[in-house]
Amino acid sequence: MSIVGMRKFMQGKMQYVMLALAAVMAVGIVGIGIGSGRGGSVQDDSSGVMAKINGEKIERQDFETQYQNQTEQNQGNLPSAFEEAQARGRLFDSIVDQMIKVQAAEKAGVKVGRGEVKKKINEYINMRISQLKEQALANRKGKKTDEAFEAELKRSGMSLAQIKTDLRKAIDPKMVQDQLMIQKQMDKIKEGIDTSDRAVKASFDEIQLAQITVSSKTRPMAQAEQRAKDVLAKARSGESFAKLAGQFSEDAYSASGGDQGAFVRKSNLPEELASTLFGLKAGEVAGPIKQADGYVIYQVKDRRNALPADFNDPKKRKEYRDTYVQQEQAIVQAKAESDMRKNASIVVNDPEIKGYLITKNIGSYLGPDGGVRAKAKAKEAIKEFEKAINQSSGNSQALARCYSQISYLYYVMCKTGLLSPTPQEKIDFRKKGIDSVNQALKYTESNDLRTLLADLYIDDKNYDAALKELKYVSDNEFYDYNVHMQILGKYEQMKSARPEIVAQRIADEQKWIADYEQRMKEAQAAQEAQQAEQTTKPFKVNPGSGG
């Protein structure tokens, strides 16, 4: 068999396995195998501990191997260094969530037997085989028999027995056990939901609200709190809430006397706020309730029960009950998971992961201080990435990830007003951003990074350097329409600075965009023509498809 023939044979063989494994990955039951590890940790000590969750270790080698298993499912679609950093961070988050849930289940005394694990594994395998069979015989006329499915598999060099074997090997019984424990624990938590008619009817209770907002944007938070307390005292003493809103409120509702207008249900509000407000009678007030940018005082203007007219119809009542139960289960599960995470002891040792976690939560620090805390957190994240760089021992992938993330942080700090940089800080952040991108490009190639670099050069009025980066990206980006639209926009920014060069560059980009749009039209027409002539063909699965 020729090399080309062998490659085609292996592609045909693997497409079934890859498709089948995709669904297994989706439910998180593929085990940690032994692999070389593409990502590369920031530390050489592969036996080290990345983190401890309530005292339980996340071993570095286990993490790297699991990341390797994850990336193997995306062959041919390798991420950029920044995307890889995000993927590694998300994997860490998912591992932590899984560990916390399993620990909670163990603490609650949840048990799962071997028979339950074996049964669930067989269910997963049978489910995937059924889905594969349905796809394999989608264009077949007549009965979709097991024999016909086997014949289709044979044409691609596979057998049903082999697929089942490969699937079974890919499933880690311990992870199946963990999933079952988590499910049992959640089912146990949900058992406490009141599903009586009274509870279902109460879910249709609605309140109409008015509010007074005392902002901390123009005063310290402590002063905002005291002002809100003074206004609340006036409201409780009998003064008109609408007049107080018109006089003191600092939000869009002040013109309407604080009236929000529409009625809301308990499920439309955050749990704690809903519990407070739905415990009030019409005309009563509550507060002051702290928000990110001040304090809010609420008044329940009116109450009503919006029970549907057809509620007493048995069929409709069942539908309403089912919807209510689903909503309550989702709320209870979300709260349980939030409480588990909130009460967990999470100690992270890996500086790259530390930097990721800080960066991910920077938005939560935006508030009335003009972005001071958020900016401090961004700098803290940069320090962690720098620490990771120092510990990388020259690992090029780890260096590319860390420098990429530092680049984006400096870019955000100098390009957005959310973090309120001073004029000098903008200059400093821009220069550090340029340096960081250039460092990242020593270890990775990325059109996204080069486009970001060009943007920083434009702000720095280094137009020649910006033009060079944009030309490189344009010449090497063959498929992404949006990238060429970005390039066109950046050339427009430099029209007056380098008119003799930019005019031709704009024309080139416009031509690329027009040619691309024409190719897309032709491809669409060809696809429609092919679909019109579609006849029964051998089963072919896109390896990237999950089902």
Model-derived segments and spans:
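Short, low-structural-confidence N-terminal segments
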Residues: M1-G89, K342-G547
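Charged, solvent-exposed helices and adjacent loops that form client-binding or oligomerization surfaces
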Residues: S2-R7, E64-L91, E106-S203, T218-Q223, ...
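Short acidic-hydrophobic surface loop/beta-edge motif
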Residues: V49-I53, V285-Q291
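A sequence-level detector of short linear motifs
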Residues: K57-E59, R140-D146, G287, Y298
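Well-structured core secondary-structure elements of compact alpha/beta domains
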Residues: T65-R90, T165-E191, T195-S237, E250-E271, ...
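Sec-exported extracytoplasmic/periplasmic mature domains
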Residues: Q68, E72, V96-G113, V117, ...
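Extracytoplasmic/secretory soluble proteins
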Residues: F149, L153, K316, R321-D322, ...
